[in-house]
């Protein structure tokens, strides 16, 4: 189920609480990932930031995958095993879990499905809205911002294809571009992914804090973190 972030009048919360909590995702202890967030548009705002952070998470996973794909020599099954292992630790999340499944998935002819998917990412707007909100608040939401721009960049297919012909891969300055990652290198990628996720969440919560102070929402960040766990 989903993580649900209702806002609005607190007097309406008891009328819809049971309905919303019954369809929400559940934590290991059975508690629902759904609580009243705050008055007015607090719920919508927190959901927007949640989706913005998710944009960041997906970009981080994509960059980690790209680095592993180019530097380990592993096929998609091997890469899927790495993400499956990562999902057993601090990186445990829905996105890491489905990344492993996607990497393992094969079509009927034995081809990896992922290898036939165009590297273009669309968007529904919540990532962009989060970045716009951060600009309005004067708060640095740098990681989500770069994730949104990466999606814009992915849509420039013709430009990227021309650039790849004009500037073929090989060396970047004096740095060799074909260094193979060993076990410790793979672990370093995992650590970098984890650190970047922490930065993204810290920036997201900072943005919510500023908006809460300006709008008088009195957001409960502990509750928000709890219902985001799934």
Walk through the language-model features, giving the residues of each.
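Conserved Rossmann-fold dehydrogenase catalytic segment
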Residues: 1-2, 25-55, 73-91, 96, ...
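Rossmann-like NAD(P)(H) cofactor-binding subdomain of soluble oxidoreductases
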Residues: 1-9, 13
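Generic secondary-structure signature for well-ordered alpha-helical cores
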Residues: 9, 18-29, 51-54, 58, ...
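Small-residue helix-packing motif on alpha-helices
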Residues: 13-16, 79, 144
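Short acidic alpha-helix initiation/capping motifs at coil-to-helix transition points
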Residues: 56-59, 121-128, 199
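Extracellular and organelle-lumenal recognition/adhesion modules and their flexible linkers in secreted
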Residues: 62
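Long, well-ordered alpha/beta core segments of mature domains
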Residues: 118-120, 126-137, 143-152, 171-172, ...
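A SIS-like phosphosugar-recognition module
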Residues: 132, 145, 152-155, 166-172, ...
């Amino acid at each position: 189920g989903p993580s649900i972030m209702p806002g609005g009048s607190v007097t309406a919360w008891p009328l819809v609480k049971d309905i919303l909590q019954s369809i929400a995702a559940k934590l290991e202890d059975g508690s629902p990932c759904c609580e009243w967030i705050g008055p007015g548009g607090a719920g919508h705002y927190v959901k927007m930031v949640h989706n913005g952070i998710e944009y960041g998470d997906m970009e981080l996973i994509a960059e980690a995958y790209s680095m592993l794909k180019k530097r380990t020599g592993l096929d998609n099954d091997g890469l899927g095993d790495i993400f499956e292992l990562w999902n057993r630790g601090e990186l445990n999340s829905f996105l890491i879990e489905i990344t492993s499944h996607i990497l393992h998935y094969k079509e009927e002819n034995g081809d990896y499905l992922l290898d036939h998917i165009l590297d273009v990412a669309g968007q529904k707007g919540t990532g962009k809205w989060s970045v716009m909100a951060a600009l309005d608040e004067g708060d640095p939401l740098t990681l989500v911002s770069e994730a949104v721009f990466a999606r814009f960049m992915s849509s420039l297919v013709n430009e990227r294809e021309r650039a790849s012909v004009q500037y073929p891969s090989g060396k970047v300055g004096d740095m060799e571009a074909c260094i193979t990652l060993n076990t410790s290198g793979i672990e370093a990628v995992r650590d970098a992914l984890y650190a970047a996720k922490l930065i993204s969440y810290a920036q997201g919560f900072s943005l919510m804090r500023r908006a809460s102070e300006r709008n008088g929402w009195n957001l409960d960040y502990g509750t928000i973190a709890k219902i985001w766990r799934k």
